[in-house]
Amino acid sequence: MQADFWHARWANNQIGFHLDEINPYLMRHLSRLRLQAGEQILVPLCGKTLDLAWLAAQGLEVLGVELSEKAVSDFFEEHDLRPEIDQLDGFRRYRVAGITLLQGDFFALQAEHLAQCRAFYDRAALIALPPEMRERYAGHLQAVLPTRSLGLLVTIDYPQAEMAGPPFAVPDEEVRGYYAGGWRIEELERGDVLGVNWKFLERGVSWLDEAVYLLERG
């Protein structure tokens, strides 16, 4: 899965993964990240999610990383924001009060970019990637995050043979395998969400679970 795939999805407005509401899991469980006002949270592969503005409204400093320039531009336009734009290493950096978006390749992210980061929130990053990229993504995320980080991770699971991703099925054992080294993993929620996901129903998926994890690096 190359960059051109995602650029084409955004160019053609094929963004079924974008939610027109704040993620309810985020609202329910943000407090578990134990963040204080002014502390920074990373949102990898953030798209133009409304969660960015909501997190900033909670008093946090939000750092999003997104490949698509259109997604980043759309976010600021739809929120009627006029960001300062400059370059930071290999990224185009967009900044307004409380929100910084780095437009570019997630794998170009370096530890110094996240030196002030306390936590991360992943709703649509891990599940957006095919198996061969997920391990690389999780490894790179852990390599650049500071020690003693926390994370809120949302995944889905379904019979992968019944539908081609994205979004991809990420079973529980896979999550625990990626974060086995030095992370405490707590499953906060798991539930059947097939009935409210028409895309999966139309494609004949027989079951669909959504899970939320709290990750803590000790």
Curated annotation (Swiss-Prot):
Compartmental location: Cytoplasm
Keyword Isomerase among UniProt keywords: no
UniProt binding sites for S-adenosyl-L-methionine: 10, 45, 66, 123
Annotated source species: Pseudomonas aeruginosa (strain LESB58)
Keywords tagged on the record: Cytoplasm, Methyltransferase, S-adenosyl-L-methionine, Transferase
Name of protein: Thiopurine S-methyltransferase
UniProt EC number: 2.1.1.67
PROSITE patterns referenced in this protein's UniProt entry, alphabetically: SAM_MT_TPMT
Reactions accelerated catalytically: S-adenosyl-L-methionine + a thiopurine = S-adenosyl-L-homocysteine + a thiopurine S-methylether
NCBIfam families named among the record's database cross-references: PRK13255.1, TMPT_Se_Te
Class of this enzyme: transferase
Matches recorded under Gene3D superfamilies: Vaccinia Virus protein VP39
HAMAP family reported in the protein's UniProt record: Thiopur_methtran
A molecular function (GO) term: thiopurine S-methyltransferase activity
Family listed: Belongs to the class I-like SAM-binding methyltransferase superfamily. TPMT family.
Residues passing through the membrane, by range: none
GO biological process, one term: response to metal ion
Keyword S-adenosyl-L-methionine recorded: yes
InterPro entries on file: SAM-dependent_MTases_sf, Thiopur_S-MeTfrase_Se/Te_detox, Thiopurine_S-MeTrfase, TPMT
GO cellular component: cytoplasm
